[in-house]
């Protein structure tokens, strides 16, 4: 860049300052004499560089002006004087609209002037060839890429945590495992409770389960303790509540009435032991009303069925169960279902029906277990 004074004032200043040591010989040489000479050399170099750039600019041949450029040369100056606060881009837009609004008669003198300049340019530069300058698209593309990268980083920082990792540790809901000593029965509140989710995940919508976790308790062995699995008397989770009448009537019919009146505790033990296969197969083949009730209650978490099971067992007395016994219906379950519907041979109890007169209690139990096993298979 050329200095505003043209380089002349800097030379005069250097001469005046350098003459100070000559006039004041007693004080010695000035401290700033050497730096000023270096600054003067830098200014001379910058002046030489600006002169070279001017020569290069003058060496490049400009294109001849067209009609619009000839008209806008004076019109731009006039608009700039009228609107000094407007930007050059706004002035160019106004000039373009004004030029388009002109008629052909108004444009004719400027078109003729542009043609004269073109002919003059051809005469002055016969070997002229237009070489368009390369636009600096690389820098613009880099700027755009940097902008996109900043936007992407901002979005990633919004999704990721402060340490740059997805915070997925709290999504795995842990359960408190509890152990019970051998011989003790867990209480109704022994089922597991999930840990509370962190408060910053309240905005996420978690999927709603199709069924309650307690309804699938048979498939999960963690819901039972080892003594409860070994002993048949304790079954805290079952589907007995859906069809108590059918199961109780089938199991009570296995005992003769004379022995059932005297032995109440063996009947209860037999009911507890024989309900396991029925609970296993009854889950897949429930009656229509029970299945409808289960589907209706599937979306809601249900309390532990232990309290319901104990409540039903309290008000159901052995006398009420014995009143519902039907001998003929029980014989139908033993003989007819096993032979005709399922197509299986039933040789052991085919000729003798278990009664109170002809057979011990062991034969009755074997017949009942076989009937319950075959009745729960699907009739395919």
Curated annotation (Swiss-Prot):
| Cellular compartment(s) | Nucleus
**Induction data:** Involved in multiple regulatory feedback loops with other endodermal factors, including the nodal-related factors/Xnrs. Autoinduces. Induced by activin. Induced directly by vegt; originally this is in a cell-autonomous fashion but subsequently cell contact is required for expression to be maintained.
Segment Required for transcriptional activity and interaction with ctnnb1: which positions?
Answer: 329-334
Per the Swiss-Prot or TrEMBL annotation, the motif 9aaTAD is positioned at 328-336
Gene Ontology molecular functions: beta-catenin binding; DNA-binding transcription activator activity, RNA polymerase II-specific; RNA polymerase II cis-regulatory region sequence-specific DNA binding; sequence-specific DNA binding
Key word NADP present:
no
The signal sequence is: none
The record's Pfam families line, in alphabetical order, gives: HMG_box, Sox17_18_mid
Task: For the region Disordered, give the residue spans.
Answer: 1-20, 40-59, 292-312
List cellular component terms (GO). nucleus
Q: Which residues bind DNA?
A: 61-129
Q: List the disulfide bonds.
A: none
> Where does the entry say this protein is expressed, by tissue?
In early gastrulae, expressed in the vegetal but not animal hemisphere. The vegetal region is fated to become endoderm, and endodermal expression continues throughout gastrulation and neurulation. At tailbud stages, expression is down-regulated and becomes restricted to the most posterior endoderm and the future liver/gall bladder region. By 3-7 days, endodermal expression is restricted to the gall bladder bud. Also expressed in the embryonic gut, with strong expression in the posterior gut during tailbud stages, but by stage 40, expression rises again in the anterior gut.
Which UniProt keywords are present, listed alphabetically?
Activator, Developmental protein, DNA-binding, Gastrulation, Nucleus, Transcription, Transcription regulation, Wnt signaling pathway
A GO BP term here is:
negative regulation of cell population proliferation
Which intervals hold domain Sox C-terminal? 264-379
Q: How does this polypeptide assemble, per the annotation? A: Interacts (via C-terminus) with ctnnb1/beta-catenin (via Armadillo repeats); this interaction is required for inhibition of wnt-signaling.
Summarizing the function annotation, the protein's role is: Transcriptional activator. Binds to the DNA sequence 5'-AACAAT-3'. All of the sox17 proteins are required for embryonic endoderm development and gastrulation movements, and show some redundancy in function. In addition, the sox17 proteins have distinct but overlapping roles in later gut development. Acts downstream of vegt-signaling in endoderm differentiation to induce a range of endodermal genes both directly (including endodermin and dhh/chh) and indirectly. Also represses wnt-responsive genes to inhibit wnt/beta-catenin signaling.
Q: What is known of its domains?
A: The 9aaTAD motif is a transactivation domain present in a large number of yeast and animal transcription factors.
**PANTHER family per the UniProt record, alphabetical:** SOX TRANSCRIPTION FACTOR, TRANSCRIPTION FACTOR SOX-17
Protein name from the UniProt record: Transcription factor Sox-17-alpha-A
Gene designation per UniProt: sox17a-a
């Amino acid at each position: 860049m050329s200095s505003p004074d043209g380089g002349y004032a800097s030379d005069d200043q250097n001469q005046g300052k350098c003459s100070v040591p000559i006039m004041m010989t007693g004080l010695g040489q000035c401290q700033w004499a050497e730096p000023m000479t270096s600054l003067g050399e830098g200014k001379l170099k910058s002046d030489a560089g600006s002169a070279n750039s001017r020569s290069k600019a003058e060496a490049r041949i400009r294109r001849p002006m067209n009609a619009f450029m000839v008209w806008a040369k004076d019109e731009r100056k006039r608009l700039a004087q009228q609107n000094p606060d407007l930007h050059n881009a706004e002035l160019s837009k106004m000039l373009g609209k004004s030029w388009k609004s002109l008629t052909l008669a108004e444009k004719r003198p400027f078109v003729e002037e542009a043609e004269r300049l073109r002919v003059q340019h051809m005469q002055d530069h016969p070997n002229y060839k237009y070489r368009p300058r390369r636009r600096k698209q690389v820098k613009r593309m880099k700027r755009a890429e940097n902008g996109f990268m900043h936007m992407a980083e901002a979005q990633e920082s919004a999704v990721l945590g402060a340490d740059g990792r997805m915070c997925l540790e709290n999504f795995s809901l842990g359960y408190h495992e509890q152990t019970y000593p051998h011989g003790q029965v867990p209480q109704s509140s022994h089922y597991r409770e999930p840990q509370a989710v962190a408060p910053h995940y309240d905005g996420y919508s978690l999927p709603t389960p199709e069924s309650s976790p307690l309804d699938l308790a048979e498939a999960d062995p963690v819901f039972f303790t080892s003594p409860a699995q070994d002993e048949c008397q304790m079954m805290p989770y079952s589907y007995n509540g859906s069809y108590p009448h059918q199961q109780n009537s089938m199991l009570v019919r296995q005992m003769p009435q004379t022995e059932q009146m005297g032995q109440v505790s063996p009947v209860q033990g037999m009911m507890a032991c024989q309900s396991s296969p029925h609970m296993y197969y009854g889950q897949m083949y429930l009656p229509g009303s029970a299945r409808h009730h289960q589907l209706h209650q599937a979306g809601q978490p249900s309390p532990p069925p232990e309290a319901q099971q104990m409540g039903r067992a309290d008000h159901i007395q052995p006398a009420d169960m014995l009143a519902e016994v039907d001998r003929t219906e029980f014989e139908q379950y033993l003989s007819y279902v096993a032979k005709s519907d399922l197509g299986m041979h039933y040789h052991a109890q085919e000729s003798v029906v278990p009664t109170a007169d002809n057979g011990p209690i062991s034969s009755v139990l074997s017949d009942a277990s076989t009937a319950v096993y075959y009745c729960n298979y699907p009739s395919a």
